[in-house]
């Protein structure tokens, strides 16, 4: 009876998730960053690899075109991996009329990383200027890994979320797009289980709350070593009134104590969704975007697909 109940609950959870919205054209992506250009509404999608892949489309559904790389020569940061940049996060600042892209230079599986930033007037290939490191790195062996940057403005003040594995996700105030404020980073989320698999923070505001989304679980190599069911990537959410700390999930559990309400997990042919973000679509409203493996196409990183779903809201919590 107990096993039957668990199976029923698992099937109910799987059936609760909507399939990704349509995508046409070049639909490959990995750790996507997504932004809709202010001037004409054109979408630009950024992805891990090389000098950060750029694709663009007239709408979120496509047709997507592969445009090239944001930084074709890699980063000016003198660090291993500066020709293979990770986890782009893009935002626009009205006061400078520029787009800013944070990226990570890192060594896979090690706490050996640097976060850098580039800027552009248009987001087009050929328009990006690399500014190098923002001063956030692991040279002093901190409790965090400096990858997966995510910019957020909280009550008018800019901040950066970042972190992967180790002691989890941290937040630090920014002085400007290129410099940290002189305040130490503080932890906002942590996963005590499965080798502390938590990363890819993305924070956004809705109503009176700030919502912190993150990916939890094993984030790749599924074609080589498939993890146990439920240990692959999935997307979770906590919320906070202040946006800087005290994030809790729907049950009230702290995000610093392995909390996190599941927003999206494997279902049907959708496997291991993660690397997520939220975009404000001019027509659709708030949209969750992410990468996932389509079981009908393959489980390798080169097979990953771009996924998106409109957010629904019930009692102050998002769902898809």
Swiss-Prot record:
Please list the disulfide bridges.
none
Q: Which Gene3D superfamilies does the record cross-reference, listed alphabetically? A: Glycosyl hydrolase domain, family 43 (2.115.10.20)
Q: Name one GO molecular function term.
A: arabinan endo-1,5-alpha-L-arabinosidase activity
Q: Name one GO biological process term.
A: xylan catabolic process
Q: Where is this site: Important for catalytic activity, responsible for pKa modulation of the active site Glu and correct orientation of both the proton donor and substrate?
A: 148
**UniProt-recorded name of the protein:** Probable arabinan endo-1,5-alpha-L-arabinosidase C
Keyword presence, Glycoprotein: yes
**PANTHER family referenced in this protein's UniProt entry, alphabetically:** ARABINAN ENDO-1,5-ALPHA-L-ARABINOSIDASE, ARABINAN ENDO-1,5-ALPHA-L-ARABINOSIDASE C
| Cellular-component GO terms for this entry | extracellular region
Q: So where's the catalytic machinery, residue-wise?
A: 31 (proton acceptor), 199 (proton donor)
Q: Which UniProt keywords apply?
A: Carbohydrate metabolism, Glycoprotein, Glycosidase, Hydrolase, Polysaccharide degradation, Secreted, Signal, Xylan degradation
E.C. number: 3.2.1.99
Under the heading Pfam families, the entry gives: Glyco_hydro_43 (PF04616)
* InterPro entries reported for this sequence: GH43_arabinanases, Glyco_hydro_43, Glyco_hydro_43_endo_a_Ara-ase, Glyco_hydro_beta-prop_sf
Record field: catalytic activity: Endohydrolysis of (1->5)-alpha-arabinofuranosidic linkages in (1->5)-arabinans
Q: Which residues are glycosylated?
A: 73, 137, 191
Q: Where in the cell is it found?
A: Secreted
* Chief subcellular location: secreted
């Amino acid at each position: 009876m107990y096993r039957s109940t668990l199976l029923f609950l698992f099937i109910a959870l799987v059936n609760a998730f909507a399939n990704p919205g349509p995508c046409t054209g070049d639909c490959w992506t990995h750790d996507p960053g997504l932004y809709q250009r202010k001037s004409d509404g054109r979408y630009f999608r950024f992805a891990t690899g090389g000098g950060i892949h750029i694709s663009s489309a007239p709408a979120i559904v496509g047709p997507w075109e592969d445009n090239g790389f944001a930084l074709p020569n890699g980063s000016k940061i003198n660090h291993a991996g500066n020709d293979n940049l990770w986890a782009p996060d893009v935002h626009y600042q009205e006061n400078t009329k520029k787009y800013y892209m944070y990226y990570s230079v890192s060594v896979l599986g090690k706490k050996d990383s640097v976060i850098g930033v580039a800027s552009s007037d248009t987001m087009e290939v050929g328009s990006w200027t690399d500014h190098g490191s923002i001063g956030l790195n692991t040279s002093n062996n901190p409790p965090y890994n400096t990858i997966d940057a995510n910019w957020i403005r909280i009550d008018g003040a800019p901040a950066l979320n970042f972190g992967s594995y180790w002691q989890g996700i941290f937040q630090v105030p920014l002085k400007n797009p290129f410099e940290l404020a002189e305040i130490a980073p503080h932890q906002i989320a942590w996963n005590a289980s499965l080798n502390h698999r938590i990363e890819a923070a993305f924070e956004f505001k809705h109503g009176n709350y700030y919502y912190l989304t993150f990916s939890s679980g094993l984030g790749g190599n599924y074609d080589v070593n498939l993890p146990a069911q439920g240990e692959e990537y999935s997307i979770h959410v906590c919320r906070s009134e202040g946006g800087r700390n005290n994030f809790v999930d729907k049950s009230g559990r702290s995000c610093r104590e392995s909390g996190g309400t599941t927003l999206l997990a494997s279902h049907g042919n959708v496997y291991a969704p993660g690397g997520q973000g939220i975009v404000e679509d001019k027509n659709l409203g708030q949209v969750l975007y992410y990468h996932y493996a389509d079981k009908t196409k393959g489980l390798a990183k080169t097979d990953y697909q771009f996924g998106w779903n409109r957010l629904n809201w019930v009692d102050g919590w998002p769902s898809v």
